[in-house]
Protein backbone atom coordinates (compact mmCIF):
# COMPACT_ATOMS: atom_id res chain seq x y z
CA UNK A 1 0.00 0.00 0.00
CA UNK A 2 2.79 2.41 0.95
CA UNK A 3 4.61 1.54 -2.26
CA UNK A 4 1.49 2.34 -4.34
CA UNK A 5 1.09 5.68 -2.57
CA UNK A 6 4.75 6.43 -3.19
CA UNK A 7 4.39 5.57 -6.89
CA UNK A 8 1.28 7.74 -7.20
CA UNK A 9 3.13 10.58 -5.55
CA UNK A 10 6.04 10.22 -7.95
CA UNK A 11 3.64 10.21 -10.93
CA UNK A 12 1.85 13.35 -9.70
CA UNK A 13 5.13 15.17 -9.13
CA UNK A 14 6.36 14.04 -12.55
CA UNK A 15 3.22 15.29 -14.30
CA UNK A 16 3.43 18.62 -12.48
CA UNK A 17 7.06 18.98 -13.49
CA UNK A 18 6.21 18.13 -17.11
CA UNK A 19 3.39 20.68 -17.21
CA UNK A 20 5.74 23.26 -15.75
CA UNK A 21 8.38 22.49 -18.38
CA UNK A 22 5.84 22.77 -21.20
CA UNK A 23 4.62 26.11 -19.87
CA UNK A 24 8.20 27.34 -19.58
CA UNK A 25 9.00 26.30 -23.15
CA UNK A 26 5.83 27.98 -24.44
CA UNK A 27 6.72 31.18 -22.58
CA UNK A 28 10.23 31.11 -24.06
CA UNK A 29 8.77 30.63 -27.55
CA UNK A 30 6.41 33.59 -27.05
CA UNK A 31 9.29 35.77 -25.84
CA UNK A 32 11.39 34.76 -28.85
CA UNK A 33 8.52 35.52 -31.25
CA UNK A 34 7.94 38.91 -29.64
CA UNK A 35 11.65 39.72 -29.87
CA UNK A 36 11.56 38.82 -33.56
CA UNK A 37 8.49 41.00 -34.05
CA UNK A 38 10.09 43.96 -32.30
CA UNK A 39 13.22 43.67 -34.41
CA UNK A 40 11.26 43.45 -37.65
CA UNK A 41 9.02 46.34 -36.63
CA UNK A 42 12.05 48.52 -35.88
CA UNK A 43 13.42 47.64 -39.33
CA UNK A 44 10.24 49.02 -40.90
CA UNK A 45 8.37 45.78 -41.64
CA UNK A 46 4.76 47.03 -41.87
CA UNK A 47 3.25 43.57 -41.26
CA UNK A 48 5.39 43.18 -38.13
CA UNK A 49 4.42 46.67 -36.96
CA UNK A 50 0.75 45.83 -37.38
CA UNK A 51 1.06 42.45 -35.66
CA UNK A 52 3.10 43.82 -32.75
CA UNK A 53 0.57 46.63 -32.40
CA UNK A 54 -2.16 43.99 -32.09
CA UNK A 55 -0.27 42.43 -29.19
CA UNK A 56 -0.09 45.75 -27.35
CA UNK A 57 -3.68 46.61 -28.26
CA UNK A 58 -4.98 43.30 -26.86
CA UNK A 59 -2.41 42.75 -24.12
CA UNK A 60 -1.42 39.40 -25.66
CA UNK A 61 1.92 38.30 -24.21
CA UNK A 62 2.70 41.89 -23.22
CA UNK A 63 1.28 44.55 -20.92
CA UNK A 64 -1.64 46.24 -22.69
CA UNK A 65 -0.46 49.64 -23.93
CA UNK A 66 -2.67 51.72 -26.23
CA UNK A 67 0.04 54.35 -26.77
CA UNK A 68 2.53 51.80 -28.12
CA UNK A 69 -0.19 50.16 -30.18
CA UNK A 70 -1.23 53.48 -31.73
CA UNK A 71 2.36 54.39 -32.55
CA UNK A 72 2.92 51.07 -34.31
CA UNK A 73 -0.40 51.17 -36.16
CA UNK A 74 0.56 54.68 -37.27
CA UNK A 75 3.91 53.53 -38.64
CA UNK A 76 2.27 50.69 -40.57
CA UNK A 77 -0.45 53.03 -41.86
CA UNK A 78 2.19 55.54 -43.00
CA UNK A 79 3.46 52.78 -45.28
CA UNK A 80 -0.03 52.31 -46.68
CA UNK A 81 -0.95 49.08 -44.88
CA UNK A 82 -4.74 48.97 -45.24
CA UNK A 83 -5.25 46.73 -42.20
CA UNK A 84 -3.53 49.32 -40.00
CA UNK A 85 -5.52 52.18 -41.52
CA UNK A 86 -8.74 50.31 -40.81
CA UNK A 87 -7.68 49.65 -37.22
CA UNK A 88 -6.88 53.33 -36.66
CA UNK A 89 -10.33 54.15 -38.00
CA UNK A 90 -11.89 51.78 -35.45
CA UNK A 91 -9.83 53.26 -32.61
CA UNK A 92 -10.91 56.81 -33.49
CA UNK A 93 -14.53 55.71 -33.92
CA UNK A 94 -14.56 54.10 -30.48
CA UNK A 95 -12.35 56.65 -28.75
CA UNK A 96 -9.92 54.06 -27.39
CA UNK A 97 -6.87 55.71 -25.85
CA UNK A 98 -7.76 59.02 -27.51
CA UNK A 99 -10.73 61.38 -27.92
CA UNK A 100 -13.45 59.96 -30.15
CA UNK A 101 -13.41 61.45 -33.65
CA UNK A 102 -15.77 60.21 -36.35
CA UNK A 103 -14.12 62.55 -38.82
CA UNK A 104 -10.67 61.00 -38.36
CA UNK A 105 -12.26 57.55 -38.31
CA UNK A 106 -13.80 58.24 -41.70
CA UNK A 107 -10.46 59.49 -43.04
CA UNK A 108 -8.64 56.30 -42.09
CA UNK A 109 -11.49 54.04 -43.20
CA UNK A 110 -11.50 55.73 -46.59
CA UNK A 111 -7.73 55.29 -47.01
CA UNK A 112 -8.09 51.55 -46.41
CA UNK A 113 -11.36 51.24 -48.34
CA UNK A 114 -9.95 52.67 -51.58
CA UNK A 115 -7.25 49.99 -51.36
CA UNK A 116 -9.99 47.37 -51.37
CA UNK A 117 -10.02 46.49 -47.67
CA UNK A 118 -13.48 44.92 -47.18
CA UNK A 119 -13.70 45.62 -43.45
CA UNK A 120 -12.90 49.28 -44.01
CA UNK A 121 -15.47 49.46 -46.81
CA UNK A 122 -18.09 48.06 -44.44
CA UNK A 123 -17.06 50.41 -41.62
CA UNK A 124 -17.16 53.41 -43.95
CA UNK A 125 -20.61 52.37 -45.13
CA UNK A 126 -21.82 52.23 -41.53
CA UNK A 127 -20.66 55.81 -40.89
CA UNK A 128 -22.65 56.97 -43.92
CA UNK A 129 -25.71 54.91 -42.93
CA UNK A 130 -25.77 56.28 -39.38
CA UNK A 131 -24.62 59.79 -40.23
CA UNK A 132 -21.86 59.58 -37.64
CA UNK A 133 -19.30 60.74 -40.17
CA UNK A 134 -21.10 64.08 -40.40
CA UNK A 135 -23.43 63.24 -43.28
CA UNK A 136 -26.28 60.74 -43.59
CA UNK A 137 -26.01 59.29 -47.09
CA UNK A 138 -27.76 56.01 -47.89
CA UNK A 139 -26.50 56.01 -51.46
CA UNK A 140 -22.85 56.21 -50.37
CA UNK A 141 -23.50 53.66 -47.64
CA UNK A 142 -24.98 51.12 -50.05
CA UNK A 143 -22.17 51.70 -52.53
CA UNK A 144 -19.52 50.83 -49.93
CA UNK A 145 -21.57 47.91 -48.59
CA UNK A 146 -21.77 46.46 -52.10
CA UNK A 147 -18.02 46.79 -52.59
CA UNK A 148 -17.42 44.90 -49.34
CA UNK A 149 -20.14 42.35 -50.12
CA UNK A 150 -18.44 41.55 -53.43
CA UNK A 151 -15.55 40.32 -51.27
CA UNK A 152 -17.91 38.13 -49.22
CA UNK A 153 -17.85 40.37 -46.14
CA UNK A 154 -20.84 38.90 -44.19
CA UNK A 155 -21.89 42.05 -42.31
CA UNK A 156 -21.87 44.04 -45.55
CA UNK A 157 -24.00 41.39 -47.25
CA UNK A 158 -26.48 41.65 -44.39
CA UNK A 159 -26.59 45.44 -44.73
CA UNK A 160 -27.35 45.21 -48.46
CA UNK A 161 -30.23 42.89 -47.58
CA UNK A 162 -31.42 45.33 -44.91
CA UNK A 163 -31.49 48.19 -47.43
CA UNK A 164 -33.74 46.14 -49.70
CA UNK A 165 -35.95 45.05 -46.79
CA UNK A 166 -36.44 48.61 -45.54
CA UNK A 167 -36.57 50.26 -48.96
CA UNK A 168 -34.07 52.97 -48.05
CA UNK A 169 -33.37 53.81 -51.71
CA UNK A 170 -36.64 52.82 -53.36
CA UNK A 171 -39.43 50.30 -53.01
CA UNK A 172 -39.04 47.45 -50.55
CA UNK A 173 -37.87 44.25 -52.21
CA UNK A 174 -38.26 41.29 -49.87
CA UNK A 175 -37.04 38.78 -52.46
CA UNK A 176 -33.71 40.56 -52.93
CA UNK A 177 -33.48 41.13 -49.19
CA UNK A 178 -33.81 37.41 -48.58
CA UNK A 179 -31.19 36.63 -51.24
CA UNK A 180 -28.64 38.85 -49.54
CA UNK A 181 -29.60 37.66 -46.07
CA UNK A 182 -29.15 34.03 -47.15
CA UNK A 183 -25.76 34.82 -48.61
CA UNK A 184 -24.70 36.53 -45.39
CA UNK A 185 -26.23 33.76 -43.25
CA UNK A 186 -24.22 31.15 -45.13
CA UNK A 187 -21.11 33.14 -44.22
CA UNK A 188 -22.11 32.97 -40.56
CA UNK A 189 -23.70 36.41 -40.04
CA UNK A 190 -26.04 36.09 -37.05
CA UNK A 191 -27.91 39.32 -37.85
CA UNK A 192 -28.81 37.92 -41.27
CA UNK A 193 -29.95 34.65 -39.71
CA UNK A 194 -32.14 36.62 -37.31
CA UNK A 195 -33.59 38.69 -40.15
CA UNK A 196 -34.47 35.54 -42.10
CA UNK A 197 -36.26 34.29 -39.01
CA UNK A 198 -38.10 37.60 -38.67
CA UNK A 199 -39.24 37.52 -42.30
CA UNK A 200 -40.48 33.93 -41.89
CA UNK A 201 -42.27 34.85 -38.66
CA UNK A 202 -44.13 37.78 -40.24
CA UNK A 203 -44.46 36.28 -43.72
CA UNK A 204 -42.49 39.03 -45.45
CA UNK A 205 -42.01 37.89 -49.05
CA UNK A 206 -42.60 34.26 -48.03
CA UNK A 207 -45.38 32.19 -46.53
CA UNK A 208 -45.57 32.70 -42.78
CA UNK A 209 -43.77 29.85 -41.05
CA UNK A 210 -43.10 29.93 -37.30
CA UNK A 211 -41.13 26.68 -37.35
CA UNK A 212 -38.75 28.01 -40.00
CA UNK A 213 -38.51 31.28 -38.09
CA UNK A 214 -37.52 29.41 -34.95
CA UNK A 215 -34.90 27.45 -36.87
CA UNK A 216 -33.22 30.65 -38.10
CA UNK A 217 -33.49 32.25 -34.67
CA UNK A 218 -31.76 29.27 -33.09
CA UNK A 219 -28.89 29.56 -35.58
CA UNK A 220 -28.41 33.21 -34.70
CA UNK A 221 -28.89 32.66 -30.96
CA UNK A 222 -26.18 29.99 -30.99
CA UNK A 223 -23.81 32.82 -31.86
CA UNK A 224 -25.11 34.94 -29.00
CA UNK A 225 -27.34 37.24 -31.04
CA UNK A 226 -29.56 39.03 -28.46
CA UNK A 227 -32.34 39.90 -30.90
CA UNK A 228 -32.67 36.25 -31.89
CA UNK A 229 -32.68 35.22 -28.24
CA UNK A 230 -35.49 37.67 -27.54
CA UNK A 231 -37.43 36.43 -30.56
CA UNK A 232 -37.15 32.81 -29.39
CA UNK A 233 -38.46 33.88 -26.00
CA UNK A 234 -41.41 35.60 -27.66
CA UNK A 235 -42.34 32.51 -29.68
CA UNK A 236 -42.23 30.35 -26.54
CA UNK A 237 -44.22 32.86 -24.52
CA UNK A 238 -47.00 32.98 -27.10
CA UNK A 239 -46.83 29.38 -28.32
CA UNK A 240 -45.99 30.24 -31.91
CA UNK A 241 -44.48 27.25 -33.72
CA UNK A 242 -43.93 25.56 -30.36
CA UNK A 243 -45.99 24.69 -27.33
CA UNK A 244 -46.26 27.71 -25.01
CA UNK A 245 -43.60 27.45 -22.32
CA UNK A 246 -43.09 30.36 -19.91
CA UNK A 247 -39.96 28.86 -18.38
CA UNK A 248 -38.30 28.57 -21.79
CA UNK A 249 -39.48 32.07 -22.62
CA UNK A 250 -37.96 33.52 -19.46
CA UNK A 251 -34.70 31.64 -20.05
CA UNK A 252 -34.29 33.15 -23.50
CA UNK A 253 -35.41 36.60 -22.43
CA UNK A 254 -32.83 36.49 -19.66
CA UNK A 255 -30.06 35.68 -22.15
CA UNK A 256 -31.09 38.59 -24.36
CA UNK A 257 -31.54 40.98 -21.45
CA UNK A 258 -28.03 40.19 -20.29
CA UNK A 259 -26.85 41.84 -23.50
CA UNK A 260 -29.08 44.86 -23.07
CA UNK A 261 -32.04 43.90 -25.27
CA UNK A 262 -34.75 46.28 -24.03
CA UNK A 263 -37.67 44.24 -25.43
CA UNK A 264 -36.48 41.22 -23.44
CA UNK A 265 -36.10 43.36 -20.32
CA UNK A 266 -39.64 44.64 -20.73
CA UNK A 267 -40.98 41.10 -21.23
CA UNK A 268 -39.20 39.93 -18.07
CA UNK A 269 -40.83 42.80 -16.22
CA UNK A 270 -44.22 41.71 -17.53
CA UNK A 271 -43.67 38.06 -16.60
CA UNK A 272 -42.52 39.00 -13.09
CA UNK A 273 -45.42 41.39 -12.61
CA UNK A 274 -48.08 38.87 -13.59
CA UNK A 275 -46.37 35.68 -12.42
CA UNK A 276 -46.13 33.97 -15.80
CA UNK A 277 -44.27 30.74 -15.08
CA UNK A 278 -42.71 32.26 -11.96
CA UNK A 279 -44.03 33.64 -8.66
CA UNK A 280 -45.08 37.31 -8.98
CA UNK A 281 -42.25 39.63 -7.94
CA UNK A 282 -43.06 43.33 -8.19
CA UNK A 283 -39.54 44.43 -7.23
CA UNK A 284 -38.09 42.38 -10.10
CA UNK A 285 -40.80 43.70 -12.41
CA UNK A 286 -39.88 47.27 -11.50
CA UNK A 287 -36.20 46.53 -12.05
CA UNK A 288 -36.69 45.07 -15.51
CA UNK A 289 -39.10 47.80 -16.59
CA UNK A 290 -36.64 50.43 -15.36
CA UNK A 291 -33.72 48.89 -17.27
CA UNK A 292 -35.76 48.82 -20.48
CA UNK A 293 -37.18 52.30 -19.89
CA UNK A 294 -33.67 53.70 -19.39
CA UNK A 295 -32.97 52.62 -22.97
CA UNK A 296 -36.03 54.46 -24.25
CA UNK A 297 -38.31 51.44 -24.68
CA UNK A 298 -41.75 53.08 -24.93
CA UNK A 299 -43.75 50.06 -23.77
CA UNK A 300 -41.49 49.67 -20.74
CA UNK A 301 -41.85 53.37 -19.91
CA UNK A 302 -45.63 52.97 -19.86
CA UNK A 303 -45.44 49.74 -17.83
CA UNK A 304 -43.04 51.30 -15.32
CA UNK A 305 -45.28 54.33 -14.87
CA UNK A 306 -48.41 52.21 -14.40
CA UNK A 307 -46.82 49.81 -11.88
CA UNK A 308 -45.18 52.63 -9.93
CA UNK A 309 -48.46 54.53 -9.62
CA UNK A 310 -50.24 51.35 -8.57
CA UNK A 311 -47.74 50.55 -5.82
CA UNK A 312 -47.57 54.11 -4.54
CA UNK A 313 -51.34 54.29 -4.37
CA UNK A 314 -51.81 50.95 -2.59
CA UNK A 315 -48.95 50.62 -0.09
CA UNK A 316 -46.23 53.26 0.36
CA UNK A 317 -44.08 50.91 2.47
CA UNK A 318 -44.25 48.15 -0.16
CA UNK A 319 -43.38 50.72 -2.83
CA UNK A 320 -40.32 51.87 -0.91
CA UNK A 321 -39.07 48.30 -0.35
CA UNK A 322 -39.69 47.34 -3.97
CA UNK A 323 -37.85 50.44 -5.18
CA UNK A 324 -34.77 49.60 -3.09
CA UNK A 325 -34.73 45.99 -4.32
CA UNK A 326 -35.22 47.15 -7.90
CA UNK A 327 -32.31 49.60 -7.65
CA UNK A 328 -29.99 46.83 -6.44
CA UNK A 329 -31.13 44.50 -9.22
CA UNK A 330 -30.57 47.19 -11.85
CA UNK A 331 -27.02 47.85 -10.62
CA UNK A 332 -26.14 44.13 -10.60
CA UNK A 333 -27.52 43.61 -14.10
CA UNK A 334 -25.73 46.70 -15.41
CA UNK A 335 -22.36 45.42 -14.17
CA UNK A 336 -22.97 42.02 -15.77
CA UNK A 337 -24.01 43.66 -19.03
CA UNK A 338 -20.82 45.72 -19.22
CA UNK A 339 -18.70 42.62 -18.68
CA UNK A 340 -20.61 40.69 -21.36
CA UNK A 341 -20.33 43.57 -23.83
CA UNK A 342 -16.58 43.85 -23.26
CA UNK A 343 -16.07 40.12 -23.80
CA UNK A 344 -18.17 40.10 -26.95
CA UNK A 345 -16.33 43.07 -28.40
CA UNK A 346 -12.98 41.42 -27.72
CA UNK A 347 -14.16 38.20 -29.38
CA UNK A 348 -15.40 40.02 -32.49
CA UNK A 349 -12.18 42.02 -32.73
CA UNK A 350 -9.99 38.95 -32.32
CA UNK A 351 -11.85 37.14 -35.08
CA UNK A 352 -11.47 40.20 -37.26
CA UNK A 353 -7.74 40.38 -36.53
CA UNK A 354 -7.40 36.72 -37.43
CA UNK A 355 -8.98 37.42 -40.81
CA UNK A 356 -6.72 40.43 -41.32
CA UNK A 357 -3.59 38.41 -40.56
CA UNK A 358 -4.74 35.74 -43.02
CA UNK A 359 -5.41 38.43 -45.59
CA UNK A 360 -1.87 39.75 -45.13
CA UNK A 361 -0.55 36.21 -45.52
CA UNK A 362 -2.40 35.79 -48.81
CA UNK A 363 -1.39 39.20 -50.17
CA UNK A 364 1.94 40.46 -51.41
CA UNK A 365 2.64 41.87 -47.96
CA UNK A 366 3.99 38.55 -46.70
CA UNK A 367 6.38 38.22 -49.63
CA UNK A 368 7.65 41.74 -49.01
CA UNK A 369 8.07 41.02 -45.29
CA UNK A 370 10.30 37.93 -45.06
CA UNK A 371 10.71 38.20 -41.28
CA UNK A 372 6.99 37.64 -40.80
CA UNK A 373 6.17 35.48 -43.80
CA UNK A 374 2.84 33.83 -44.58
CA UNK A 375 3.32 30.99 -42.08
CA UNK A 376 3.99 33.34 -39.16
CA UNK A 377 1.04 35.52 -40.12
CA UNK A 378 -1.24 32.47 -40.19
CA UNK A 379 0.13 31.39 -36.82
CA UNK A 380 -0.82 34.81 -35.44
CA UNK A 381 -4.33 34.24 -36.81
CA UNK A 382 -4.48 30.89 -35.00
CA UNK A 383 -3.35 32.56 -31.78
CA UNK A 384 -6.11 35.16 -32.05
CA UNK A 385 -8.73 32.48 -32.60
CA UNK A 386 -7.45 30.52 -29.61
CA UNK A 387 -7.80 33.63 -27.44
CA UNK A 388 -11.30 34.21 -28.83
CA UNK A 389 -12.22 30.62 -27.90
CA UNK A 390 -10.96 31.22 -24.35
CA UNK A 391 -13.11 34.34 -24.07
CA UNK A 392 -16.14 32.46 -25.41
CA UNK A 393 -15.70 29.92 -22.63
CA UNK A 394 -15.58 32.78 -20.12
CA UNK A 395 -18.73 34.24 -21.67
CA UNK A 396 -20.48 30.87 -21.42
CA UNK A 397 -19.49 30.75 -17.77
CA UNK A 398 -21.28 34.05 -17.20
CA UNK A 399 -24.46 32.53 -18.67
CA UNK A 400 -24.20 29.56 -16.30
CA UNK A 401 -23.60 31.87 -13.35
CA UNK A 402 -26.54 34.05 -14.35
CA UNK A 403 -28.83 31.05 -14.68
CA UNK A 404 -27.89 29.83 -11.21
CA UNK A 405 -28.57 33.25 -9.68
CA UNK A 406 -31.82 33.93 -11.56
CA UNK A 407 -35.12 33.89 -9.66
CA UNK A 408 -36.38 30.36 -8.90
CA UNK A 409 -38.73 28.91 -11.48
Label each PLM-derived region with a short phrase.
Residues 42-45, 58-60, 65, 78-81, ...:
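Short helix-capping/linker turns of helical repeat alpha-solenoids
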Residues 10-20:
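Bacterial N-terminal signal peptides
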